[in-house]
Amino acid sequence: SPDGEYAEETGLEKEQIVVLRRAFDSFDRDKKGYISPETVSDILRMMGIKVSSTSFKQIIEEIDEDGSGQIEFSEFLQLAAKFLIEEDEEAMMKELKEAFRLYDKEGNGYITTQTLKEILHELDARLTAEELVGIIEEIDEDGSGTVDFDEFMAMMTG
């Protein structure tokens, strides 16, 4: 299905693509196969996505590959993906920050590798002791026995 291909190209979920297709079609009343940048901006607003006019202009220029000044469905999907996927990443960053803060009880900006072992074990109980040691050695490059937030982030998102 074309939606399946779009999902692969954009990294969006199929359900998201269906919703976006409906939004696109409802604005493309004459079934021309494209909508105006202004319409795109309205759709994004309806989806609760805030975007400044400057960055919106830049994105439109980037997305409107054929320079038609009109946004075809595939271009529209690429644009929506930028916002939807970035939001997911931001949400994940927030969750990781909170998880880190929870374990960094003294607020030192780092956790011990022992604490990290416990976190990893909670995330995946199938990890063996050897695997845990391997992961820890990879993360705690300087062998300090502590892991700061950046090292933690790199591990979780890498």
UniProtKB/Swiss-Prot annotation:
Misc. comment: There are two different troponin C in barnacle. This protein binds two calcium ions.
UniProt keyword annotations, A-Z: Acetylation, Calcium, Metal-binding, Muscle protein, Repeat
One cellular component term from this protein's GO annotations in UniProt: myosin II complex
Keyword match Transferase: no
Chain positions with N-acetylserine modification: S1
All residue ranges annotated as the EF-hand domain in the record: 15-50, 51-86, 91-126, 127-158
PROSITE patterns: EF_HAND_1 (PS00018), EF_HAND_2 (PS50222)
Organism superkingdom: Eukaryota
One of the record's GO molecular function terms: calcium ion binding
Residues that, per the record, bind Ca(2+) 1: D64, D66, S68, Q70, E75
PANTHER family: CALMODULIN LIKE 3 (PTHR23048:SF0), MYOSIN LIGHT CHAIN 1, 3 (PTHR23048)
One Pfam family of this chain: EF-hand_7
Entry annotated with the keyword Repeat: yes
Function summary: Troponin is the central regulatory protein of striated muscle contraction. Tn consists of three components: Tn-I which is the inhibitor of actomyosin ATPase, Tn-T which contains the binding site for tropomyosin and Tn-C. The binding of calcium to Tn-C abolishes the inhibitory action of Tn on actin filaments.
Binding-site residues for Ca(2+) 2, renumbered to this chain: D140, D142, S144, T146, E151
Family: Belongs to the troponin C family.
Protein name: Troponin C, isoform 1
